[in-house]
Amino acid sequence: MTLKIFNSFGNKLEEFVPLKGKDVGLYTCGPTVYDNAHIGNFRAYAWEDILRRYLEYSGYKVKQIMNLTDVDDKTIRGANENKMALSEYTEKYKKSFFEDINALNILPAHNYTSATEHIPEMVKLVETLMEKGFAYRGDDDSIYFSIKKFPNYGKLAGIDVTKLKDGARIKQDEYEKEGVGDFAVWKAWDEDDGTVFWETSLGKGRPGWHIECSAMSMKYLGETFDLHTGGVDNKFPHHENEIAQSEAATGKKFVKYWMHCEHLLVNGKKMAKSAGTFYTLRDLIDKGLNPKAIRYVLINSQYRQQINFVIDSVHDAEKAIDGIQRFIDRVRNINEGDGNAETEISDLITSFEGAMDNDLGVPNATKALFEFVKKVNTLIDNSQLGKTGAENVLDALKKVDSVLGIMDFTEVFFEVTDEQQKLIDERNVARNAKDFAKSDELRDKLKAEGIELVDNPDGTTTAKAA
């Protein structure tokens, strides 16, 4: 089976065929660094991570570019309100973003492109649009893209430009479909911008949000590239405007495949600070939640469907991941025997790849994983898995986790003291004598000292770091 993805441009499932053999250019819309990213943002970033990982799993060589929007209406407003220089203000949120994606085990992009470092490319793109008659200077001295000059405007978001009011212009970065009009590609300086401006051939001002991504994506991936992703809220106006200005400038198709993930709800509703349902990743970690469990919740859904994020779902994910980790420890401790798990491993890989090839069907992929764990546990219970088979099981898990990113294969080595070993021995005596009260008491005492006991079906007990 080959990978099929849902192309938002045309709204249909298509076979993924890159432009250049096994090379894939991937542009992912990154954060606007005016605040800490919220959990809804990370739903998109985690899904994009799954996409990249599975492309690499499938043998593609991916070049991922992610933008960091460090100059726009929001960042300027935030810097002004905090009486900080724009670069100082945005730098702290860039830093926190990188810390957050590391906590969620999201692979770093090959290049993070900051808008403020690419002003010359943006100026050149605007100049090209003006030379070709697609952009004009307004009476406020800002430069606007004329959407009626671009016949295909609205094809991504489904907008009929023939019904638009002539002369309508929009200077702000974000707006609804009902307010569509010519959009700013270069914003003339005004007092609200304070010290944020560039003196260029276009005049004193700054780029519009949409021109930033067009200029940066084409610089690093070419005038036409394979994949552009983002949240569904980026579809309009941002991605629609990217297509218009890029294709108007080059005369070429901008992107072959567009992919968008749906919104994340919290407790069934849109996130709201007033309702106490607005979470940053840091908020959740401060509540004691495991980042990998948060990742599991974010990825374990069909990306084109809304997900309802509730704290209980993270607790359930923690239990699921803990079960996998216990399984890994159990398999790792098999040191003898001849049994293998060839059929179970083959079934896992076939089911996993079949699910992922169908528009990144993570829920069915994780279902295959847990069925595999159950089957192999049965083999172990019946002494039907040997050392070589166990090694193959671990290799299969590592292969699957190269996509999911939720497991930990780090072996923790530690030494117990003589006193702790004495407690372990006493606890084994109590367990064998079915003195469960004493057994549990000693188990809890050892756990308080950082040692967790795992009772194996063969009667042995494994001690590991708690």
Q: What does each model-found stretch correspond to?
A:
Residues 99-133:
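N-terminal, positively charged, Ser/Thr/Ala/Gly-biased leader segments
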Residues 56, 102, 130-131, 259, ...:
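Alpha-helix C-terminal capping/helix-coil junction sites
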Residues 82-88, 109-111, 306-308:
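Short, polar/flexible loop-turn hinges at active-site or ligand-entry regions and domain interfaces
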Residues 64-65, 110-113, 228-230:
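Short catalytic-loop micro-motif centered on adjacent basic/acidic residues
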Residues 10-15, 19-105, 454-458, 462-463:
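N-terminal, positively charged nucleic-acid-binding surface of large information/translation enzymes
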Residues 61-63, 133-139, 452-454:
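Short, well-structured beta-strand/strand-turn elements
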